[in-house]
């Protein structure tokens, strides 16, 4: 079992802890498929809602909050029935806008894994306004069920009434809808090809500044992030923060980064290069490779 889970496993009901210990091996990054969830519920004689709330300490153990020291865990349940854990991330000594909220982390985990819908969000503290707006960008966002400890389950519309969202700006394919934007680039570099793939799946309907980041560690592992814009602009999630959040879930140290690539559309109304460099240089002494590509 990974060291980061040792403390939280002791907080769980013993039957659940016994079932989880074999799962929390070195490969565990916060994802459980629908069958694993069903098996855990059966083995522990818990309802699925009870189980997911009980798993929140595991999700919170994925957090890196050096500023607030407040560990928040979230779980996104996808339309597939799989669950995706996420946790808050803060960059030590840096401006707070670099932070990733737990709900953003969980949702980006699901998006990067190919989910096209989120049905439930389980979180150990009431979602802040930033996260409510971020969730409202999703497919059928207002219908997402929000689960909190010791509170009745409510749809997002309960927490964000009279919401402003993508439909108000005539966006017909909100976040998690299949995106496929075509760009031209000739490269045999596997890392750049991977970045191009994620660029084509990014979500930027307001600025058309489609973008993706790929980070490579010294052992050759790669971690990706895509731009996820928001109708309210400020809750948009930058690709560098998404990639760093993925690294944190994988229990990797940012000092392991030895290469970083940002790829973005040449036709966007904005550029993410400045914000991306700021975040990268806060965690690693690596120069950013910046590539602009033309849409087809």
From Swiss-Prot:
Binds 1 zinc ion. It catalyses: cytidine + H2O + H(+) = uridine + NH4(+); 2'-deoxycytidine + H2O + H(+) = 2'-deoxyuridine + NH4(+). Zn(2+) binds at residues 101, 128, 131. The active site is at 103 (proton donor). Pfam families: dCMP_cyt_deam_1, dCMP_cyt_deam_2. Residues 47-167, 186-296 form the CMP/dCMP-type deaminase domain. It is an enzyme of class 3 (hydrolase). Its EC number is 3.5.4.5. GO terms for biological process: cytidine deamination. Its cofactor is Zn(2+). Keywords: Hydrolase, Metal-binding, Zinc. InterPro entries: APOBEC/CMP_deaminase_Zn-bd, CMP_dCMP_dom, Cyd/dCyd_deaminase_Zn-bd, Cyt/Deoxycyt_deaminase, Cytidine_deaminase-like, Cytidine_deaminase_bacteria. Coiled coil: none annotated. Substrate binds at residues 88-90. PROSITE patterns: CYT_DCMP_DEAMINASES_1, CYT_DCMP_DEAMINASES_2. SUPFAM superfamilies: Cytidine deaminase-like. Belongs to the cytidine and deoxycytidylate deaminase family. This enzyme scavenges exogenous and endogenous cytidine and 2'-deoxycytidine for UMP synthesis. HAMAP family: Cyt_deam. This is Cytidine deaminase. It comes from Shewanella loihica (strain ATCC BAA-1088 / PV-4). The lineage of its organism: Bacteria, Pseudomonadati, Pseudomonadota, Gammaproteobacteria, Alteromonadales. The gene is cdd.
């Amino acid at each position: 079992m990974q060291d980061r889970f040792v403390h939280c496993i002791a907080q769980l009901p013993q039957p659940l802890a016994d079932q989880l210990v074999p799962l929390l091996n070195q490969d565990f990054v916060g994802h459980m498929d629908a069958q694993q969830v069903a098996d855990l519920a059966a083995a522990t004689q818990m309802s699925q809602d009870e189980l997911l709330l009980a798993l929140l300490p595991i999700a919170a153990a994925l957090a890196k909050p050096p500023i607030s020291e407040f560990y928040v865990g979230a779980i996104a349940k996808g339309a597939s029935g799989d669950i995706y854990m996420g946790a808050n991330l803060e960059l030590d000594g840096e401006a707070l806008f670099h932070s990733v909220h737990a709900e953003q982390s969980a949702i980006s985990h699901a998006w990067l894994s190919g989910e096209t819908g989120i049905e439930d969000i389980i979180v150990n503290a009431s979602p802040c306004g930033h996260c409510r707006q971020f969730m409202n960008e999703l497919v059928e966002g207002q219908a997402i069920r929000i689960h909190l400890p010791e509170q009745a389950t409510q749809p997002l519309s309960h927490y964000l009434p009279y919401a402003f969202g993508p439909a108000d700006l005539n966006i017909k394919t909100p976040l998690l809808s299949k995106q496929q934007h075509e760009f031209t680039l000739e490269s045999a570099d596997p890392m750049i090809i991977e970045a191009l793939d994620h660029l084509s799946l990014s979500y930027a309907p307001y600025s058309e500044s489609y973008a993706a980041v790929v980070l490579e560690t010294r052992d050759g592992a790669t971690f990706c992030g895509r731009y996820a814009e928001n109708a309210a602009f400020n809750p948009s999630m930058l690709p560098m923060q998404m990639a760093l959040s993925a690294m944190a879930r994988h229990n990797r140290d940012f000092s392991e980064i030895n290469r970083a690539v940002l790829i973005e559309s040449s036709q966007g109304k904005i550029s993410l290069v400045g914000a991306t460099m700021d975040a990268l240089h806060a965690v690693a002494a690596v120069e950013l490779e910046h590539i602009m590509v033309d849409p087809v």
